[in-house]
């Protein structure tokens, strides 16, 4: 089954995809910081039961992963592939996660709060993600009684999620704005509207892959629709600015834009050993080439999916052991050679 981040919509614009998070605590249990192991296990069993009972309605099958039974790199791989919201995960708890087969829905149990429902969507479809998250929320609420106050909304241990208990974010690919050295200025402007804009991936460069995450900072006093509408508006403005800059650069010197894209393709397609940051830089160029129709139409290049799957922890998880830096370099090159299509030069878009 194709994962949500492998869908074509992830490559059709500066907005790669979106995620909605609903944070919930369950009546009858103390907050996570005060729970003992028995309570955490009981809560996990209750949530697993609720999810299993909801599979038919949601038309999704879920896999359960208990973090006490997996290695660190396997848990890190789930975080790297966006199944686990890193801001909600806290190591050391009796925690687990239920993930749908396409990885579009995950339910984190015993993170920093009792529950975090996460729904991911490709492209600019945050409203659809919000609707699906609401459906999951309603299904689970039939079996779990949420801690809720008429005055404060959903009760959480962190004031960040008090109110709707909802957070939403978009992943954006912004290489042309980045080249213009305006990202810090944009981050300040975005913060005035109650949102953050930060590099998504960790690496030695400032923003590996030129991928950024825009997220709301607060939920109290705001409705879910207000949060998602503001996010859509701000992300849409950034996407328009990115596309306008790209068009300007292509109109001024198309060859100057296209040549590095083909060089990047050749490097990572045929290399035998690849470092993380250099690969991210090349994949960013491939993503821009896909977005601006450089590659043949039948060439299925999914740069964002490759970004996720060639991360260190994901490569270790695929090898089923914690591999060395040198082994990761070889494994990364092997993975990319297998998953990037061979381009027919006769079908390539003319520069």
Task: Give the label of every model feature segment.
Residues 1-151, 166, 180, 184-187, ...:
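Long, Pro/Ser/Thr-rich low-complexity/intrinsically disordered regulatory tracts in eukaryotic proteins
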Residues 153-170:
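Conserved phosphate/anionic-ligand binding catalytic regions in large, soluble enzymes, centered on
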């Amino acid at each position: 089954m194709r994962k949500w981040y492998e869908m074509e919509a992830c490559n059709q614009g500066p907005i790669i995809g979106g995620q909605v998070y609903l944070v919930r605590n369950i009546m009858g249990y103390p907050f996570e910081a005060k729970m003992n192991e028995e309570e955490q296990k009981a809560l996990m069993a209750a949530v697993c039961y609720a999810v299993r009972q909801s599979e038919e309605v949601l038309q999704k099958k879920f896999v359960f992963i208990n973090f006490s039974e997996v290695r660190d790199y396997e848990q890190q791989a789930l975080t790297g592939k966006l199944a686990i919201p890193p801001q909600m995960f806290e190591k050391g708890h009796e925690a687990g996660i239920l993930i749908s087969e396409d990885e579009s829905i995950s339910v984190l149990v015993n993170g920093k709060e009792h529950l975090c429902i996460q729904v991911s969507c490709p492209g600019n479809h945050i409203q659809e993600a919000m609707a699906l998250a609401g459906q999951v929320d309603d299904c689970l609420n039939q079996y779990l009684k949420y801690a809720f106050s008429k005055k404060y909304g959903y009760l959480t241990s962190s004031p960040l999620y008090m109110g709707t208990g909802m957070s939403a974010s978009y992943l954006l690919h912004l290489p042309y704005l980045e080249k213009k050295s305006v990202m810090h200025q944009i981050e300040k402007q975005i913060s005035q509207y109650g949102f953050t804009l930060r590099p998504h991936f960790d690496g030695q460069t400032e923003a590996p892959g030129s991928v950024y995450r825009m997220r709301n900072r607060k939920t109290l006093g705001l409705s879910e629709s207000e949060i998602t509408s503001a996010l859509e508006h701000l992300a849409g403005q950034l996407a328009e600015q990115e596309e306008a800059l790209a068009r300007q650069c292509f109109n001024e010197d198309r060859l100057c834009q296209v040549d590095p894209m083909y060089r990047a393709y050749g490097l990572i397609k045929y290399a035998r050993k690849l470092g993380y940051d250099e690969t991210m830089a090349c994949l960013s160029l491939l993503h821009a080439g896909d977005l601006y129709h450089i590659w043949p139409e039948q060439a299925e290049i999914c740069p964002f999916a490759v970004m996720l799957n060639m991360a260190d922890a994901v490569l270790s998880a695929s090898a089923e052991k914690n591999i060395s830096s040198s082994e990761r370099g070889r494994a990364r090159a092997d993975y990319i050679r297998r998953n990037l299509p061979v381009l027919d030069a006769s079908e390539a878009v003319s520069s």
